[in-house]
Amino acid sequence: MSRNASNAYLKNGNSTPSNDKRSPSSLSQRSKTSTRSSKPFLQRLFPSTWFKNESSSRHPLTSIKENDTQTIGRRPSMRVKLFGKDKSKASMSTNDLPSHPRSQSVMGFSSSTSQLTGTSNSSRTRLNKDMRRDFGMTSMSSITSSTPTPSQLPVRPSTSLSFFDDIPLGPSFSAETILSSLSISTSNNAMSKTTPAPPLVTTKSISADQDDFYTCKEEVSTYEGLNSQIELSPVKSRDSQNKSAKNLSTAYRTVSGESRNLMVDPKVSPYGNSRTPLRDSSNYLRDRRSINRQSSLSIPKSTSETTRKTLALSNGGIDQSRVSSDSFKVDDSSAKMAAIDIWEGSQHIVSNDKALSWLVTDKPYNKAVLKHYISLYDFENTDILQSLRMICGNLYVHGETQELDHFLGEFSNQWCRTNPKGLFCNPQIVHSIAFSLLLLNTDLHIAELSASERMSRNQFVENTYRSIKQALNDSFDGNEEKKNAFFLSSYKSFASNESCNSPAIHSLHGNLSPGKSAELKKLHKRSLSSKVLEEAFSSYWMSALKEMYHSIKVSMILQPDRYLDMNFDFNDTNKINNPSSTANQTRHFHSVSEIKKLPMGTDELEKSMVRPSTAMYINRQNENAVSIDKSRDLQGTVNTKEIRSRSALSYQNDRPLATDLPSVIYNHKHPNVVSPFYVHPYIKQGILKFQSKESHKFRKKEVWSTVLAVLQRDVFTLYNLNTPNLSYDPKDLDISKVGKPVIKTTIIASLAKPFPSSEDAVVLKSTNSLYFDLETSSQLKLRFAGPSPKDAQGWIDALNYWAARSSKVPLLGGVTNVDYGWARCTGQRAQKSNAQLLKTKTDKIIVHKWQPQPVNTIPSSLSLGEQLSAFNNFMKLLKKTNDEHQNLHKEMLVVLSSQPKSTFRRAVENWKYKSDYLQLNLVRLRVYISVLEKYKSQAQNS
């Protein structure tokens, strides 16, 4: 049976097919008669519950012009589900239906091609076949009848293009036009009804082979609007060779016969938390292949505010210049989501290299995002340089001078908000210093200048201080009273105990002499003249700027582009040998959580997995690199013996321990690949028992305290949990409620090991916990007890791993003319005759006290492979040096036998101290090499 005959058979309702071969004119006349029959076509097309046989006024549909026709041959891109209206308003009688000789268009699809184009039946049939061939459509073999039953609401019968081939009925109009012409009230809104909505066309009501309503056969997600629905279905790229093509979800909507599409990210709902309907898009779908070519979305002004801002956040390729931020009120929640997106570097809003320019754009929405972005950084107890390193390690701080000036202004405000008691600081002064530090970093490390052309320390201090004074005058507009009040408040903050214990203040005036510091503390007790205030202000900033210059000279302020290899695509082995492919991806270094597979034998692997952040390098003193709160010890009593390194007090990592930041809450997706402390955010924390050991002696009465230990890269912090009125949950600890840290130290050049050994380990009877010791570079020993032997070993591995990753190769000392007792045995005395050599043995020898080389407390920037190679090479040199030193012992005793006892004793002590130092370095190096090889092998084999 032919398709035309089948359609005629269905229309007439005959029991047998008809072989009627009449002309098109007779068929048209027959269609006119059938539309006036007792059961019109619309009643057969739509559910019977939509119509009632009651008189009503003439429907507005009769005013539709006949010229309102739709374009033929457009491939329908989706199914549109129509919400029915109230029966009292949606009911239509038979007399209300218009009768026209033109063909009827339903849901935007042309019902007849012959009436609009003047073609014959045969040409029309060929046209339909061509359309189905071009768009991959298949003919419908059967039509599902939809008869209402009491138990199930009736559904509209399925339709296809072949169904309307021979049914010319009236003028062209769409089903969307039908419903839009009806009066709509709140009670008619299907979304606000408590009762089920009118029957909808579902997937079950359409034949499986009816391909003209579907882009793919996969499950779709529906988003309901006011008068229609939008369905999102995953569409795969037709270009299989393009590996970078994204798997997008294309939303199709048919409105007034025009098929339009949206490009949205499949992971993010275009509505967010809102049910606001999505209105028309200005991107027309001309061809199915245009899905892959869509790169931006134009959001019209009529779109609701929530939808516009949510789309601006969820669409990765959105053209932000086309979104008018002035036409709607900024949504605070949307701006905060955008700020977190930029902070995480996911590039949904803007690429990382253009983030700063986008943030400082003069639009309300961008300003709101910048405000929330800056608030994500916690600069409390950090100095200006350290805070600048923190933000530069996460954001590409580059661009035009005007853009940098605007951004640094927001940075200065945030720094002053988080450090309200900063010494001699206000937003204008912080802004001037931050800008000068960026210029200094460019001059010393980035600009191609000779050594003589680079800025000297005196030039930097003078120029920056001149800028600080100008900023101070601009802040108070020459008002001397306000300026003096500002000075006095800074002095009072400095003199108070709370401010003296601040790491930021200690780090800024570490170079102040004790006399000046004592003088400043007494200034608030007597009346101060303006001259004295300005002198103190000048002395303070001169010293602070010198520290900052030296810190930047030793370690430059790094940008995120130094960590491009940390977001390595391990599934693409071509990128390992193609640096340009990695360099083109401007991503942040904290995307290590996306790692799924680890290649073997590549140095890029070690860099991407465990390279420590060097964005927070600062210059620290080597002595006593441990800070202990002098106001109280672990038992809450006053601790008279202060152990402090001012620069170590100011040290923090590039990820502050703020509980509201997303980086702190981290769930590793692949726990079998690496240890928890091995990946971002590189934090290990837990509750331990703690006992301090000083001068190699413990107290006679062992007193243990419960502490919260936090290890973040090379910074180890202890918080006392034995304070009164402190209730905590071991499973959910909030650091902000614990209080100030009692100990904060760097673990560079430190060593963690069980105490005293595996066979002599002492186990607490109550908790069955194992002891372990931590020896720092300042010779301070900290003893801990873990909850279990397994937990104790985990802490030992974590401490030794980050000590190995952060420590640089130590120095052994060079050739010197200082005699420590074995200078006569090392050949340092020139070629001499035997008589002269025998004579010198009887000379009086001046032996100096031997001291080891200071520990380099600047973290290492080498990758895991480079660090391991450096340690292996140094191990060979250290063994050779140790063997030579051991061989000097007997010869040294013979040479010093004729010397006084004091000289002999000091020489022997010096030899022993150096021997112990070499032995300690050998043990530490063996542990470092072992732990690095362990985790490198674990990463390669996983």
Swiss-Prot record:
Residues 1-128, 259-308 are annotated as: Disordered. Residues 1-18, 50-60, 90-125, 271-284, 292-305 have a biased composition (Polar residues). Residues 681-804 form the PH domain. Gene3D superfamilies: Arf Nucleotide-binding Site Opener,domain 2 (1.10.1000.11), Pleckstrin-homology domain (PH domain)/Phosphotyrosine-binding domain (PTB) (2.30.29.30). GO terms for cellular component: cell cortex; cell cortex of cell tip; cell division site. Residues 295-497 form the SEC7 domain. InterPro entries: PH-like_dom_sf, PH_9, PH_domain, Sec7_C_sf, Sec7_dom, Sec7_dom_sf. Residues 24-40 have a biased composition (Low complexity). GO terms for biological process: cell growth mode switching, monopolar to bipolar; intracellular protein transport; positive regulation of G2/M transition of mitotic cell cycle; regulation of ARF protein signal transduction; signaling; vesicle-mediated transport. GO terms for molecular function: guanyl-nucleotide exchange factor activity; phosphatidylinositol-3,4,5-trisphosphate binding. This is PH and SEC7 domain-containing protein C11E3.11c. It comes from Schizosaccharomyces pombe (strain 972 / ATCC 24843).
